[in-house]
């Protein structure tokens, strides 16, 4: 069986695409990219997908072979190069993490049925591929609490287990897969569950000047790691709506801070005696490269220390790129760290 320790995300291909076109889907990721990933030393990829790739709102329950072919070919490439594949639904019927405020998934039984039916179909399709593929239920749930999420999650697990009793299922907590929310997940008696979290701490370093974050754009500072945030008092004084940022004043950005922020996940595992996986982590590409390398070095060392697998965000583009358009790494040192190659 393949390993799921050192992975990389394929965001932007069949999820979060800028244009829904055959040309994009045929060219954004090819076999050569999977070969590049394998040669670098990674052992798996995380493949986000959006449901419109495989199901149209006009033909519910009819699954599109042309869209499914992209998952199929990625799986075949992964098998060829001995990589694992985590199949992650990024955009579900009625839910997308970017638009969670307008979500209908958790209140609409029809959307919930569609959601579970898609996974039921995929479980049947890939029932003989469990040595290479794992399913991740849904990316970055944001709900007032975990009640409705737990209910849907248990329905999903029940549906999958009626088809396949040993497929690995990756389950994340509320609030963008926060480590702090793992403890609020429903108890699951299943030996083939992996608990998934995301890690982008400290946020105003990993997301500095991120164009999609109002607060990061407002702060608009270059942040180094290790280091400290600069000008917090002045910023809050001039922008009182961000008063919550005063807690960042004089905060030391270093490995011990990362360890502290990772602690809820470690404590959860100690209590549950379960497997952990970090489905996303990373630093925005506009950050200082030396700082970017050092953050990843520190974080990977913690994942190694605590024996946690994970997948960096992101292989290319998506503002967090590890490789450029020519499949050249932004830094070979960074790739070696991420692939957990000892140098």
UniProtKB/Swiss-Prot annotation:
Keywords attached to this entry: Carbohydrate metabolism, Cellulose degradation, Glycosidase, Hydrolase, Polysaccharide degradation
Catalytic activities: Endohydrolysis of (1->4)-beta-D-glucosidic linkages in cellulose, lichenin and cereal beta-D-glucans
Catalytic residues identified in the record: 140 (proton donor), 280 (nucleophile)
GO biological process, one term: cellulose catabolic process
Transmembrane segments: none
This protein's record includes keyword Ribonucleoprotein: no
GO molecular function: beta-glucosidase activity; cellulase activity
One Pfam family of this chain: Cellulase
Alphabetical list of InterPro entries matching this protein: Glyco_hydro_5, Glyco_hydro_5_CS, Glycoside_hydrolase_SF, Glycosyl_hydrolase_5
EC number: 3.2.1.4
The keyword Repeat belongs to this UniProt entry's keyword annotation: no
GO cellular component entries: cell surface; extracellular region
Pathway involvement of the protein, from the record: Glycan metabolism; cellulose degradation
Primary role: This enzyme catalyzes the endohydrolysis of 1,4-beta-glucosidic linkages in cellulose, lichenin and cereal beta-D-glucans.
Additional remarks: CelC has an unusual substrate range and displays features common to cellobiohydrolases by being able to cleave the agluconic bond of aryl-beta-glucosides.
Protein family membership: Belongs to the glycosyl hydrolase 5 (cellulase A) family.
Record protein name field: Endoglucanase C
